[in-house]
Amino acid sequence: MPGNRKAELKLGGAFAPGERASHHGGFTLVELLVVIALVAILAAMLLPALSNSQAAAKRTQCLSNLRQMGIAANVYVGDNANVYPIAYYSDGENNIDYAWDLTTIEGNPNRVIPGLLWQGQGNVQIQQCPSFTGRANWLTDPYTGYNYNLSYIGHGQYESIPEPAKSSDVHQPPKTALFGDGQCSGGADKFMRAPFPNPGDAGFWGRNGGTQGFRHQNRSNAAFCDGHTESRQGRYTNNCENSTVAPGTGFLSPDNSAYDLE
């Protein structure tokens, strides 16, 4: 009926029978505080997981870098009468410093090219550990973070044993470290040293470098003479010179077993 129809119409902002008012207001202060607290809790839960994920990705990239360096070393050995690259030597007459990783031609400015390991060519950027944020001990080095087994493999011009080892000298290649995460009190020394002297290395004493950096979630990465890589957790700090070990650094074994040729 017309009268009933009019009664059902909205009048002065009222609602027809059966209609419900909807709430169009904003959040209350209490509701906003609850939401903010929940977001903060979720962030606190997710950030460590994200940080761990990023650290794991850097560790994986570092292992890949070391694996490529190991491959390059074995290629060098195959091309050079089974002899490993020497760790370093200097050509004073021509002002050239040769090292396993980079060759520096002195000048103004100095020119840096791929080193002996790369036989003068290659992508040397893989020599930069993605987790290393310090500096090189050698100020001319554009890349840093890795070191090479000087005590038993590479030796060098001014070492007691100047000639590098042959691959046939390494009796257990899976046990002998070739390259690794270098770090010491002064930065990143590019030369890896065993914790104790090589029996034939009379010049060992007095060196305060060559330790490994345990910067991958308390692990240190290394490549071995057979080409495989490892991420090692054991950090050994007892050696003949306490000054060799800085916070976050150490050796891969308590003795020379991770470095020697046996």
Residue ranges: model-predicted function:
Residues K10-A14, H23, V35, K58, ...:
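Short amphipathic alpha-helical "recognition" segments used for binding
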Residues H24-S64:
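Amphipathic alpha-helical segments typified by the pilin-like N-terminal helix
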Residues M1-F27:
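N-terminal leader/signal peptides at the extreme start of proteins
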Residues A21-S22, A44, F214, D226:
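Intrinsically disordered, low-complexity regions enriched for glutamine and histidine
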Residues T60-E262:
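Short, well-structured segments within or immediately adjacent to enzyme catalytic domains
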